């Protein structure tokens, strides 16, 4: 089942509803032009050309799923950000949760080594030290962006940074101006990692509390993730294509309550490069 809410699409697969939103507006905010091409088998290619000569190229299948996203540098070099070969198959029909093929998650490290709470970070360098750590499980295959966004089991292979120092007003996706500086330490870590590997991708997860309708909360959480991504790009210069966003509504509450709870209105960061990039996965 598919329906729209607040310029976003709600897709129900089985018993779970996901929110999807086009990221072209965020990626193309600073561009000279955007070129759309139709390819064989219903595929499309979207090329964003920036004033500095950089091109961001996204190829999608007939369902809109991302097959490949690359950054083409002015000298012609290509940086692969993600590549999902299975989405390019002619017999591909619908998404299947890869968690069906995985055993239950067993965390074999202390929780403090799996989750970093930004509220207790004393040294900004801790963000870098944490994000450069490998996934907590072996990566069996190269996953797609959609796999990581939609499957909690796949996503949980990557450690997470809980940005508890950024909260949102009830029903709001706006970041308070006095909270923007709290992103600086994280932004420095992202910049450093991207400088070392321009193909890095970081997922920003948006969340809400449990008050309100599920669909509205999915859309709201997606806008929260997008707001943080825009701030990282506009204020700290993090390339938009190195950031992916996804809203999860009230599905993953930090505080188990059905009441209004600021700690549940939050964002979470994960470095998902090893899950979606062929070279990183091989390593």
Language-model features: locations:
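Generic beta-strand hydrophobic packing signal
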Residues: 57, 69, 202, 241-243
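Short coil/turn segments at secondary-structure junctions
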Residues: 166-174, 211-216
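Low-complexity segments
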Residues: 1-165
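Solvent-exposed coil/turn segments that connect beta secondary-structure elements
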Residues: 14-16, 51-53, 60-64, 72-74, ...
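Periplasmic peptidoglycan-binding/anchoring modules of Gram-negative envelope and division proteins
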Residues: 143-153, 161, 168-205, 229-234, ...
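Envelope-exposed proteins and targeting segments
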Residues: 44, 53, 157-164, 171, ...
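Periplasmic OmpA-like peptidoglycan-binding domain that tethers envelope proteins to the cell wall
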Residues: 178-180, 205-283
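Short polar/acidic secondary-structure junctions
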Residues: 49, 195, 259-260
């Amino acid at each position: 089942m598919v329906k729209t809410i607040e310029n976003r699409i709600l897709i129900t697969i089985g018993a779970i509803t996901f929110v999807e939103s086009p990221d072209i507006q965020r990626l193309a905010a600073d561009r000279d032009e955007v070129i759309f091409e139709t390819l064989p088998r219903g595929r499309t290619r979207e090329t964003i050309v920036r004033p500095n000569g950089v091109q961001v190229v996204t190829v999608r299948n007939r369902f809109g799923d991302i097959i490949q996203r690359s950054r083409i540098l002015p000298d012609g070099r290509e940086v692969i950000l993600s590549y999902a070969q299975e989405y390019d198959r002619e017999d591909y029909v619908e998404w299947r949760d890869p968690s069906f093929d995985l055993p239950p998650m067993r965390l074999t490290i202390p929780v403090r080594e799996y989750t970093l709470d930004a509220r207790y970070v004393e040294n900004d360098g801790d963000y870098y030290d944490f994000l450069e750590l490998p996934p907590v499980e072996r990566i069996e295959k190269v996953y797609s962006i959609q796999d990581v966004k939609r499957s909690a089991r796949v996503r949980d292979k990557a450690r997470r940074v809980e940005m508890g120092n950024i909260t949102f007003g009830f029903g709001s996706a706006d970041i308070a101006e006095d909270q923007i500086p709290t992103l600086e330490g994280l932004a420095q870590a992202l910049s450093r990692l991207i400088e070392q590997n321009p193909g890095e991708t970081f997922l920003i997860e948006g969340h809400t509390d449990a008050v309100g309708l599920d669909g509205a909360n999915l859309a709201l959480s997606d806008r929260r993730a997008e707001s943080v991504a825009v701030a990282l790009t506009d204020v700290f210069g993090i390339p938009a294509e190195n950031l992916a966003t996804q809203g999860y509504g009230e599905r993953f509450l930090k505080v188990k309550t059905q009441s209004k709870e600021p700690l549940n209105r939050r964002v979470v960061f994960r470095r998902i490069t090893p899950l979606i990039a062929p070279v990183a996965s091989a390593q």
